[in-house]
């Protein structure tokens, strides 16, 4: 389910010249023992392992949250093997709100961390990359080389500061809205909602409606101007955020139910 493996246009291989080795965890969460088993001794025929990445929360696994103890155990196992550790924390603060565990505690086992400001926090643009002084200096150089310098970025930073100060706790509302949306779709003929809605994402399968996910998405846009992502042939992903109200959840759920019932195979 790893985001850096399944998306980003293969940037890991293109820009870093690196290949990935996927660990088959439970809902995107693997164990220290699985990490130990996956790290192969470097030989002529095998690439040298260098880094382990944890995605918090796990997007394609339904927004699942890594427990703090699992994070610590994987971090310790990685250090024992001399591996660099990175947290893809695009939705880290959703995990913070869901568990009550601080971002600092979740981040402690990692050398570097990525935090997105434009998802649940609601900024129009922006993200934060964190690490030690030497790493950040190198990151700035590579950012410049690859055309990532912005002019001017102060207004983006100001929005990020506001979001971090005012929008974190309110994400609990997004989580509640996601659970509510899942409940509203729960008994819809032709719709199969995935279990375990932990944060702000709801995944559901539309195969029973006779439509593909892309067809279902396009018809929702056409009929009700509602946009829900098509993630796979039949799998769809709905994401709640600060612009989605309880009334909006009910409206969207009604539209999904109506479309599903109208297209059920007869």
Task: Cite the ranges covered by each PLM segment.
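Conserved PLP-enzyme active-site core in the AAT-like
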Residues: 1-195, 199-223, 229-244, 251-266
